[in-house]
Amino acid sequence: MDLESESSVLESVEDNNGLIGDLDKELNSPVETSPLISKGFGLRKWKRRLRRDLVKDDTSVSMENSKALKRVLSGLVDPNAKQMHLPGPEVRQDSVGSVGSVNSVVGFVMGGESYGNGLAFAAGVDSDNSEDRSSTMSHSWDKHRGKVSGGKSVISSGDSSQQRKSSVEKSNKLRGERIKIEKENSHSSMESADSRSSNFVFMQGASYSLSSREQGGRRMMDYDDENSDHDAHTSKRKDNVEEEEEETEDYSQGDCVEESQIKSNGSSDNLDPLIVAVNSFQTLQEALQKELQKFQELGKEEPITSLHDGGESSSCIHAGHEGASEASSSYRFGSEKMGEMELTSLDSEILNLVNNVEHLEIKLEEAKRILEVKETQIRELESTINVSETCNGGTEIGIEDIFQQKVEAEIEYIIFSRSVGNLKRRIKLIEEEKTLGLSKLDKAETKAENLKNQAQDLQNHCVEITEIQEVECLKKRAFKTTRCLLLQLGLLFILYYSLLPEPEIAVPT
């Protein structure tokens, strides 16, 4: 069993040699491969045993496939192992199962890219087509830099934490870009469908997509039944993988699968049936526009008809929008019965276009009739206007004379008003001069009165001065007379005392 497991692993590695070579060129990390063991009875081809009795649901099979891919890819990103070594017998059996699960999931991814390429992709079988499969897988897995080496672990030289962070960041970026692309595609498809689609086109696209999905689902069921043995065998290895590695590998797997689906949808021959239906409807719409342009060229002389025709065409387009919304709802909630109307959709669409053209022709005729009626009304109005102009010729002359008189009166009024204004200004100046003269007279009178008062004051002062001088003279005379009298009295007393006899005084001895 050991030799058989080793030989099966080595053979699967040889089948996937192209894929491993491309990934090794990307990673630029040295990987040591285990040498060939030539002991025993030689290498035997590993064959897959199919269990037809075991049946599973689509969801369980897809979940087991994703879990198996997580476990295998988590083993591929292990940074601690630096060499490839041969494990024990139990581990070898698990590795064989893991290789089968990897190849089965790879087949699932390639089948999801286009239904025409097939869903059954098995390792160890169809060795001639292994190079083509490996090249397509390397192209789809090129951006994510998956590290695969046939069931054994491929080791990079960087740190594990940095690798995990970088892988998580890359997966998040790719997921964001994928979501943006899906939103843009959905918005663009819905806008084009709303503006240019009809019920039958969407019914055709829905039926075609449903039939293709049913076929792909049947193929996936058959392929999952074939891989059920290996999925059941590989489901026992849950406890050997950490949660972080499972999340990162899950993100990278989903992004890789969806990116490969986007690429295959852009490049494969089996295009989206909705896009094909929309393109066919665009061609039909262009043909209808050309016919409408021809009708417009025929009716260039009547512009109102073209306007009316545009209104009717806009109403038809509005009806087409409503039909597009109904078609989108039928596309979403359609059933398998829509597949029966694929062949009759184009015929019914052509009939609808013919009916629309006939309806537009009827509307054109009605618009022409309305135009004729309006032209007659316009002619009647022009005739009435001419009659009114002839009657109103004399009144216009009188109105002109009155207008001239009015203008002259206004000019005279302006002149008189200006002259009156000038006179008023002059009167104001004269009055101001009078007031200035009166103010000057008042000032002169006040000055004269002041001078008179000053003269009177001087006279009074002079009188007072003379009176004071006279009083002083009288005072001087009185002072002289009193002084003379006092001198005379003093002399008399002196003479009197000198004439008196001296008294006799007893002098003691």
UniProtKB/Swiss-Prot annotation:
This is WPP domain-interacting protein 2. It comes from Arabidopsis thaliana. Residues 166-186, 229-240 have a biased composition (Basic and acidic residues). Keywords: Coiled coil, Membrane, Nucleus, Transmembrane, Transmembrane helix. Residues 187-198 have a biased composition (Polar residues). The chain crosses the membrane at residues 485-505. Residues 1-33, 126-198, 210-256, 304-330 are annotated as: Disordered. Mediates and enhances the nuclear envelope docking of RANGAP proteins mediated by WIT1 and WIT2 in the undifferentiated cells of root tips. As component of the SUN-WIP-WIT2-KAKU1 complex, mediates the transfer of cytoplasmic forces to the nuclear envelope (NE), leading to nuclear shape changes. A motif (Nuclear localization signal 1) lies at residues 44-45. A motif (Nuclear localization signal 2) lies at residues 47-48. Residues 483-509 form the KASH domain. Homodimer, and heterodimer with WIP1. Component of Ran complexes at least composed of WIT1 or WIT2, RANGAP1 or RANGAP2, and WIP1 or WIP2 or WIP3. Interacts with RANGAP1, RANGAP2, WIT1, WPP1/MAF1, and WPP2/MAF2. Interacts with SUN1 and SUN2. Interacts with KIN1. Core component of the LINC complex which is composed of inner nuclear membrane SUN domain-containing proteins coupled to outer nuclear membrane WIP and WIT proteins. The LINC complex also involves nucleoskeletal proteins CRWN/LINC and possibly KAKU4 and the cytoskeletal myosin KAKU1. Interacts with WIT2. It is found in: Nucleus envelope; Nucleus membrane. Residues 277-302, 340-389, 431-470 form a coiled coil. GO terms for molecular function: protein heterodimerization activity; protein homodimerization activity. GO terms for biological process: nucleus organization. Residues 241-256 have a biased composition (Acidic residues). The KASH domain, which contains a transmembrane domain, mediates the nuclear envelope targeting and is involved in the binding to the SUN proteins. Residues 1-11, 150-165 have a biased composition (Low complexity). PANTHER family: WPP DOMAIN-INTERACTING PROTEIN 2. GO terms for cellular component: cell plate; nuclear envelope; nuclear membrane. The keyword Transmembrane helix applies. It is a single-pass membrane protein. The keyword Glycoprotein does not apply. A motif (Nuclear localization signal 3) lies at residues 70-71. Expressed in seedlings, roots, stems, leaves, and flowers. The lineage of its organism: Eukaryota, Viridiplantae, Streptophyta, Embryophyta, Tracheophyta.
